[in-house]
């Protein structure tokens, strides 16, 4: 009986696509309203002044301005704010 029995297939062999999360704009950069600042899972960063949060926790600019990262409150939350651009250089 020189036959080889069929081997079982591997249970691995697949992977999910990368989700391209992370910071898209850094502190001090000038961005237009509607631009994505951070794509994240959960609230690693919180929305501050002039920043909105999408249903997938993406942070985006509500106004044209300069991005600023700050730590706020007793809980030391990492917060993103956008200081409105008025036309003069920062």
Curated annotation (Swiss-Prot):
Signal peptide coordinates: none
Organism name: Laribacter hongkongensis (strain HLHK9)
One GO BP: translation
Record-linked SUPFAM superfamilies: Ribosomal L27 protein-like
Keywords in alphabetical order: Ribonucleoprotein, Ribosomal protein
Keyword GTP-binding: no
The keyword Ribonucleoprotein is assigned to this record: yes
Family: Belongs to the bacterial ribosomal protein bL27 family.
GO terms for MF: structural constituent of ribosome
HAMAP family: Ribosomal_bL27
Protein name: Large ribosomal subunit protein bL27
Spans annotated as Disordered: 1-21
GO cellular component, one term: cytosolic large ribosomal subunit
């Amino acid at each position: 009986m020189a036959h080889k029995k069929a081997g079982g297939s591997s249970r691995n062999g697949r992977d999910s696509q990368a989700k391209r999360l992370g910071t898209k704009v850094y502190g001090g950069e000038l961005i237009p309203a509607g631009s994505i600042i951070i794509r994240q899972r959960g609230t690693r960063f919180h929305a501050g002044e002039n920043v909105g949060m999408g249903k997938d926790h993406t942070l985006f600019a509500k106004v044209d301005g300069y991005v600023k990262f700050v730590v706020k409150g007793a809980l030391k939350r990492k917060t993103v704010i956008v200081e409105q651009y008025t036309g003069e250089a920062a």
